[in-house]
A protein has these predicted regions:
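Catalytic, metal-anchored helix/loop core of enzyme active sites in primary metabolism
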Residues: 1-187
Length: 187
C-alpha cells in the first residue's frame, strides 16, 4: 500500500518512542460527502468509479466503502507496532498526501506524491537505494489546496467495524456472530 510505504519513509531514522500517531489518508472514494441514507441504492458500477486512483473493481469497491482503510489500520498496527489509538484516518480527496506521521513534539511529516503505485513499488524493490526512473513527478505549482476531513463512520460502517476489530485485538477481524453476520458496531 502507498500509505504504509509513506509511513515507513516518514519514520525511517526516528525512534519508535518518538512516534505519537499516524494518519492514514483516504480519498473518500466516489461517495465522499454522501450520508448513509443516500448510499442505500448505489450500484456496483458507481463504486468502481474512483475519482483519483486507477484500480481494479474489487479494490475500488473496498475503497468506496472505506473497507480498505479499515484493513490498512490493522496492517499498520502490525507493521509499525502501534496501538489502534495511535492510528487515525483522515479524508484527503486530492490523494496527494499518502500518509502522515505525528511525533511526540507535535511535528508532523507528510509523504506526498502522484497517484501512481509505481513509486511505492519502486521504493520497496530498490530500498535502501533511491533509483530514478522517468515517471511523472508531482508538480507543486498545480495544487491549489490540500484538504482534510474526518471520516463519517455512520455512512461507512466498514471502517467502524475494522476499527472495532482492531481495538478488540487477536482474531477479532475473523470472528462472526452466531447468525453468521458481523456484530453490531457502535459508531
Amino acid at each position: 500500500d502507498s500509505e504504509h510505504n509513506a509511513i515507513f519513509q516518514c519514520i525511517h531514522g526516528h525512534e519508535q518512542s518518538d512516534l505519537a500517531c499516524i494518519h492514514l489518508t483516504a480519498s473518500g472514494g466516489p461517495f465522499y460527502g454522501r450520508d448513509r441514507a443516500s448510499l442505500v441504492n448505489v450500484a456496483p458500477e458507481q463504486a468502481t468509479k474512483h475519482p483519483t486512483w486507477d484500480m481494479g473493481a474489487k479494490i475500488s469497491v473496498d475503497s468506496a466503502t472505506l473497507m480498505n482503510k479499515g484493513l490498512e489500520i490493522v496492517e499498520a498496527m502490525w507493521l509499525f507496532d502501534l496501538s489502534p489509538e495511535q492510528i487515525d484516518v483522515v479524508i484527503h480527496p486530492q490523494s496527494i498526501i499518502h500518509s502522515l506521521v505525528e511525533f511526540n513534539d507535535g511535528n508532523i511529516l507528510a509523504h506526498m506524491g502522484v497517484t501512481d503505485m509505481k513509486f511505492p513499488i519502486l521504493f520497496a524493490l530498490t530500498y535502501p537505494e533511491r533509483v530514478e526512473l522517468p515517471m511523472e513527478r508531482l508538480d507543486l505549482t498545480t495544487m491549489k489546496a490540500l484538504t482534510f476531513d474526518a471520516p463519517d463512520f455512520s455512512a461507512f460502517p466498514c471502517l467502524a467495524l475494522a476499527r472495532h476489530a482492531a481495538k478488540a485485538g487477536g482474531t477479532a477481524p475473523a470472528k462472526r456472530s452466531r447468525n453468521g453476520l458481523a456484530p453490531e458496531v457502535p459508531v
